[in-house]
Amino acid sequence: MDVFRQPSVQRDGNGDLRTIGFEIEFTGVSLTDTIAAVENTYPATRKNATAAACDLDIPDLGVISVELDWEFLKQQAEEAGTFATDDWVSLLSQAAELVVPVEVVCPPLAITRLDKLLPLTGALREAGAQGTGTSFIAAYGVHINPSCPALDSATIWNYLRAFSLLQWWLVEAHAVDLTRRATTYVDLYPEAYLRQLFSTTTAPQTTQLIADYLSHNPTRNRALDMLPLFSEIDAAAVQSAVPDDRIKSRPTFHYRLPNCQIDSSDWSLANSWNVWWTVEELAQRQKDLDTLSARYLEQHRAVLGVKRNTWVAFMDQWLRDHELA
């Protein structure tokens, strides 16, 4: 499916089109060949090139960053200088390609221009890129970074409720690979947090919303990582709970759940986005969020919690009845 479904809310509070960023992780292609694939797809100018990373500046699109997803290797390459000039770093880079995924970080694009990325995934596939299902030890995936329509508490709370009501269903909708489920990288929110989130029908103050999240989720390893967005609002609170310099403040959600199926000819980034689209739409339905939250709490059983399979089946039927799935 190559059509990106458009959400009901396309613009932010300033009237600007919302932006979406994608990060794609894969193996099977060297860093050098990945860069070449991008250059063969768009008119690109290389910048900041090392043996572990390269930025490609593309007119009318922005900067696509290509890098080996290994913090140590990237640091060593930066210290060595320009692209492939240090033999030791270059050798290490080549060895890393066997086990370390290449990551392509796309620039944030206006929500109506996401189809500009379709040629990229096709070119990477032709170059030999392999996605989630090709590794038993690595949890390759696609990350989606949609800008939040507004940074007020009510808006963020509704997105959190929408995702939380759907998180089990989303795992099934994406057919998340067992290897990825077994890691901590895409852990779901704990049920204790969901019960707290659903226990009121009025949005908490922003400081309380952030504090509640950090209390239950003091980690980057969540399927919907809110730390970048909350850091944009209150960086000190986030760093106090999760002192990690990899957290970059930005007014976006960081959705990490989808597989990367780049080696499949019938897959594109639209497949991943169109599942997230369901979260977008549910987040705009205040009354439905209230009703579904109450229903979830009614289903809670002492010690056992909510029965997952039953809830997934209920949500799947509800979404179909409301033309959201």
Annotated model-derived regions:
Residues 1-102, 108-122, 126, 151, ...:
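C-terminal accessory/tail domains of diverse enzymes
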Residues 126-135:
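Active-site palm subdomain of RNA-directed nucleic acid polymerases
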Residues 136-143:
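Short, conserved phosphate-binding/catalytic loop or strand-edge motifs used
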Residues 143-145, 254:
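Structured core elements
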Residues 147-149:
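Catalytic palm subdomain of template-directed nucleic-acid polymerases
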